[in-house]
Structure formats: structure tokens, C-alpha cells
């Protein structure tokens, strides 16, 4: 819920390499008017797994840090993350998660931040 991207692992199992993602993200952030946009479906495994998760698995490799992600896009909308507080980042990401998973994400949000969503 913070905006970091894990694109090479499922759990602790590596499924791909980084490719050019890090270079592309850094280039976008360094260019005049550039923005990083992470576009993805909100779910995986035929809708059984949310791709927006409250925590990454311990030991999973972060491909792109939360500081480098400007926008995350799913079929449910756009979350603008740049310049947002951790609470606002989490709210924005929950807002673009698949509706079937939002309740669970909100529960974790409320536990973590000790406040109502």
C-alpha cells in the first residue's frame, strides 16, 4: 500500500528479470515533464489474487521504490502517488484495487495507521 513495485518475484520465487524497468523509470523521472506510470490489471490468477497488496513478502525484491512511482493505473482508475503521505498513498491505491479486495485492504490500512479509512 506504499507504492513500491515488485515485478520480478511472486513471493520469494523469481519469475523474471528486471529488464529495463529501472532505467525507464529513472529516465522518466529525470526528463522534463516526465512521469512514471505503472499500468497493470488489478488482479492475477483469474481474479483470485489482488495485485495491490498491503505488504510485500519478506525477502521479495523491490524493483521500483515508492519514491520513483508517480502513478499506478488499473482498470478501476488512476492513483497519483507523487508527493502524497503514506496514508494518502494507501487510500489512493485501495481506490484502484479490485472491489472484491478493498475491504481487506481497508482493514489492514486501519490497523496500520490506527484510524478509520
Residue ranges and their predicted role:
Residues 1-117:
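Conserved phosphate- and dinucleotide-binding cores of soluble alpha/beta proteins
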